[in-house]
Regions:
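Short, surface-exposed glycine/acidic/tryptophan-bearing loops
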Residues: 100-101, 157-178
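An acidic, Gly/Ser/Thr/Pro-rich helix-cap/linker signature
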Residues: 2-9, 21-138
């Protein structure tokens, strides 16, 4: 497509995107005035409260349009940048802050080049995708640096508050954004799903506050907390920008935007701080492949000619050694390995999956008993199902077991994958000391053992304490 034609197409799409906001503002003015106004004379529409209420949304759309047009200009075409870092720099759009907190965090990163090297190396797998998604939405590209702060670009990161993944979603917020969390998969760690959810959330917060710094504060602290801080300053006649609200924020949130600013400054000019960024090509690192049938992670890695660790780095959402196939199941592979996977899969003459599920019906079943039943070892079952030592399975639990000849050609159903849970309890000590207590009854003395308290452990997609930041 020629450049002029491309720009014309984008401008036409932008006009369609902006049309609803103009239409809503116009209609609000007409309805509030309760009198017909010719569509050809919109300047005559009075600025009613309803129209004014529409203006933040319209202003946000216009700002997004400005950023999109900037990316189309000859000097800032993102596809012309030599690497992803240059592409990110060209899309910076959040106002800078310059205070002592920023200086402190710049110094922290600048004096830890090893940390920066590890983080940027991990980021090289994912950051092109994040930048591309930001540009599609007309959002500031420095938001692609937020996982530096959240997770150090480690998709396996898991906090003490049960936040997980690149973008550190807690379970409840993850469910709010349709991030599935089951025994087999946690989409909070999935690169595609979590990035889509995080950008949707950030855009929603920006639409709410009309300010990216406040949107970031709300991402960390919660929108309700930011709203209350704004109301408090408004009541005192004080400004409500991020720095004016900082004294009302917890330390983590007060440092959150300055940390992002520090990373932003370093990416903008690493040489100024004696640092070097790795070259990250301005092109996709991975591609997505649909997988409609079950496949073991080890088999998928083998077919793609990848190490298991590298495969898991791109597909960290899978919790078990088997990937449940389905219409929405995708695996990510480096561009050069995707073709190898397709070729090797076509020539593969063996079963793709060696696992199926088994539901516990007995009141309590030992792992050793199950291992014997399915021709494997207790250690294999514990490792496949993340079962700690000295625990047993309770009735209703679903676990992975090796396939038998009867189940070799059967995949695990989506219904089972979505509903499976695992209930564990601590094994009874083999030599539990029986404390005896005397109970007088009918002139006779009886003895009875004191009951043992058996702690229960639930694993899978259960609830956990929500993290304050989300």
């Amino acid at each position: 497509m020629h450049e002029n034609s491309f720009k014309s197409t984008v401008l036409a799409a932008l006009a369609l995107a902006l049309a609803p906001a103009f239409s809503q503002a116009y209609e609000a003015g007409v309805e509030s005035d309760n009198a017909p106004v010719a569509a050809t004379t919109p300047a005559l529409i009075p600025m009613t409260a309803q129209v004014t209420a529409k203006l933040p949304t319209l202003d946000n759309r216009l700002q997004k349009t400005d950023r999109l047009l900037k990316n189309l200009s000859d000097n800032s075409d993102p596809l012309r940048e030599a690497d992803v870092w240059g592409r990110i720099r060209s899309g910076y759009a959040i106002p800078d802050i310059n205070n002592q907190l920023v200086a402190n965090h710049v110094n922290w990163y600048a004096t830890r080049p090893d940390h920066l090297a590890r983080t940027t190396a991990r980021a090289s797998r994912y950051i092109f995708h994040v930048v591309q998604e930001l540009e599609k939405r007309g959002m500031p590209t420095e938001l692609a640096l937020l996982p530096f702060i959240e997770s150090a670009f480690n998709p396996q990161a898991f906090s003490s508050a049960s936040a997980a993944g690149l973008w550190q979603f807690v379970p409840a917020t993850g469910r709010d954004f349709n991030l599935k969390q089951t025994m087999f998969k946690d989409d909070r760690r999935g690169v595609l799903a979590s990035t889509d959810a995080a950008l949707t959330y950030l855009q929603r917060l920006y639409d709410m506050f009309g300010d990216w710094q406040l949107a970031l504060a709300a991402y960390n602290w919660g929108e309700g907390s930011v709203q209350r801080a704004i109301k408090k300053n408004q009541a005192l006649g004080k400004p409500t920008d991020f720095e004016s609200l900082a004294d009302l924020m917890p330390a983590e949130t007060r440092n959150y935007v300055p940390k992002l600013q520090a990373v932003k400054n370093i990416i903008a000019n690493p040489a100024q701080f004696g640092l070097t960024l790795p070259v990250v090509d301005n092109q996709p690192y991975f591609t997505a492949i649909d997988k409609t049938s079950d496949i073991d992670i080890t088999v998928a890695a083998q077919l793609a000619e990848l190490s298991t660790d590298e495969f898991k780095a791109l597909n960290p959402q899978f919790n078990r050694p088997v990937i449940i196939g389905g219409e929405k199941t995708k695996i990510l592979l480096p561009q050069e390995n995707a073709a190898k996977f397709t070729t090797n899969l076509a020539q593969w003459g063996h079963a793709l999956s060696s696992w199926t599920t088994h539901k516990i019906t007995n009141a309590r079943e030992r792992i050793e008993t199950l291992a014997s039943k399915f021709g494997t070892t207790a250690d294999v079952l514990r490792q496949a199902n993340n079962i700690p030592q000295r625990t047993s399975l309770r009735a209703g639990s679903t676990i992975l077991v090796p396939k038998t000849s009867a189940t070799m050609n059967k995949d695990i159903t989506q219904e089972i994958a979505d509903s499976a849970t695992m209930l564990l309890e601590a094994d009874r000590p083999e030599r539990a000391a029986k404390a005896l207590r005397r109970v007088a009854k009918g002139g006779k003395v009886q003895t009875a053992p004191i009951s043992l308290v058996k702690p229960r452990i639930q694993r899978g997609g259960g609830n956990s304490r929500a993290k304050a930041r989300h």
